[in-house]
Amino acid sequence: MIDYELKQRIDEVKKRYEDIVKVFHPEDKKKELEELEKLMGESDFWNDQKRAKEISQNAQRIRKIIDDMVDIENKLEDLEAGLELLEEDATFLDTIKQLIDDIERKVKTFELELILNEKFDSSNAYLSIHPGAGGTESQDWASMLLRMYMRWAERRGFDVQIVDYQPGEEAGIKSAMLYIKGEYVYGYLKYERGVHRLVRISPFDANKRRHTSFASVNVMPEIEDDIDVEINPEDLRIDTYRASGAGGQYVNKTESAVRITHIPTGIVVTCQTERSQLQNKETAMKVLKARLYQLELEKRQKQLEEIQGELKDISWGNQIRSYVFQPYTMVKDHRTNVETGNIDAVMDGDIDIFIESELIFFAKSKNKK
């Protein structure tokens, strides 16, 4: 006999999977996969490399989702069989609990994979951080956020590299940019864009007063080479300088740093990570391409949320998330209302609770429109 709480979990995970089936229509997707596989089998399929790549990637994604659904359905069948055996043998209870844990985990992962279906969700990402007004305190907060996102990427097994790092005068950073490489990095991070607020007793205040600081986070997808972004070399001013800052093993400190200014738009990008000017220039050009593509999308679309939401002033009232160290400890996302008191874990990169809730929240918001 199972208890009420366990029965609730079983009913809930079944309903979540039924909701997925209603949205996804697996039989229709199986037919779509068959059509794509027919196209891929044609003799002239690879004549158009760009089209072939898009079709292959789409087929691969649909095939994975279908396989995942079959796996979940098989485990649900195992669960039903296990529940029948449980009526005769109570020792099956631990097996049932483990099976429910496994199904819940797979359904949750599957829900997120279905949500991450927009154009750039599977891309690598550039994440930049800028402190708001407040001098050293805000600059220190920006460096804390930098570490948080680096730890998150490392926890996830993603490759992370500091592309640009401008140190603060006393502590912290004036700005920094990360390049994070891995599957669905941009999709996971895209809603982290916005203003992040810190409340703490400042270590830089001799009177030990409580301070509120702000820093902004921007996230851009890496733009692949097959996406056309026209950059006229005559529109560029390229400067070189010595890299600076305490970026540890992530930052190069030779005379190879590169700054590229796109004169028509005033966009400035810098890179100081690589070991040569040529490599830094190549990386900076990739960042510039992403910035220009982002700018073009913003011109075309009134709803900036289509790619990354609206970045507001770095000030009170515009924050997406608050991190409170004193007089109590709490991290709260003001969009989803998700919160936790374990601020040390959050600052050490444990932010999936916020990322996952953001994805579900905004997916539901879009479905209502």
UniProtKB/Swiss-Prot annotation:
Stored InterPro entries: PCRF, Pep_chain_release_fac_I, Pep_chain_release_fac_I_sf, PrfB
One GO molecular-function entry: translation release factor activity, codon specific
Keyword Lipid biosynthesis attached: no
Keywords associated with the record: Cytoplasm, Methylation, Protein biosynthesis
Subcellular location: Cytoplasm
GO cellular component, as recorded: cytoplasm
Family that this chain belongs to: Belongs to the prokaryotic/mitochondrial release factor family.
Protein name (database record): Peptide chain release factor 2
Source species: Thermosipho melanesiensis (strain DSM 12029 / CIP 104789 / BI429)
